[in-house]
């Protein structure tokens, strides 16, 4: 079922501009060695204070959590909602979560917290019906049938044309009506009118890579256009053994897809509009990186 955002999550988008300093060099930072170091982020002071004070209570379920409640999808008591950025997205996002995925380890919750109006999370086997809208939807998942983001518009337009042909093949429909419908609805793939994308929703699977097959092979997802992010590398601290570094965490996949969509499909310069999707992720990444460095230093002292 759809998990709609709580009323109090509908906060002002002014939180973004209040803290964010736009950096003109953002496009070059994406390709840097540490892709998280030059993000245009809202102030993370609220997370720093929460980290120092420790776990806090969820105001909905009463559970003890750090930063946010991963079952209620809300910040905890010591993280004021008004200090959490709100991200506006160009597309709707559906996340299909594996039932055995550990909620506390999932990064999908970050998207729901930061873009509640645009993100829905479903727990498998609950999956929306996409069959009638396969020309408006794409699934981000690697595989031999996957295409790159820049080719999405072309392939979705082909689906529209195939659907039109299928409708006009009705033998009971008078031939002159079929011809007229084709003239009205059919367009050349090279025609400038057809180069815009019809994409309205993107689907992500939230699961360990070893568990994704159960969801991916579900008949309700079969036949959807598949998109793969082939050039991005993960920073995830829970990297799964034996998997390539191009296998991203859920929030990384969402973020990088939107960045590439912005430049390759919308044809606009990227200026950090979606960076706050990594608001929690980048903070946790830095915490773990610092802890690891401190641990390595302590180990070094013991071995000398």
From Swiss-Prot:
An example Gene Ontology molecular-function term: tRNA-uridine aminocarboxypropyltransferase activity
Name of protein: tRNA-uridine aminocarboxypropyltransferase 1
GO cellular component, one term: nucleus
Main localization of the protein described in the UniProt heading: nucleus
Origin organism lineage: Eukaryota, Metazoa, Chordata, Craniata, Vertebrata
Catalytic activity, reaction form: a uridine in tRNA + S-adenosyl-L-methionine = a 3-[(3S)-3-amino-3-carboxypropyl]uridine in tRNA + S-methyl-5'-thioadenosine + H(+)
Function: Catalyzes the formation of 3-(3-amino-3-carboxypropyl)uridine (acp3U) at position 20 in the D-loop of several cytoplasmic tRNAs (acp3U(20)).
Compartments reported by the entry: Nucleus
EC number: 2.5.1.25
GO biological process: tRNA modification
Keywords assigned: Acetylation, Nucleus, S-adenosyl-L-methionine, Transferase, tRNA processing
Enzyme class, first EC level, given as a word: transferase
Sites bearing N-acetylserine, chain numbering: 2
One Pfam family in the UniProt entry: DTW
Motif (DXTW): 206-209
Domain of life: Eukaryota
Family according to the record: Belongs to the TDD superfamily. DTWD1 family.
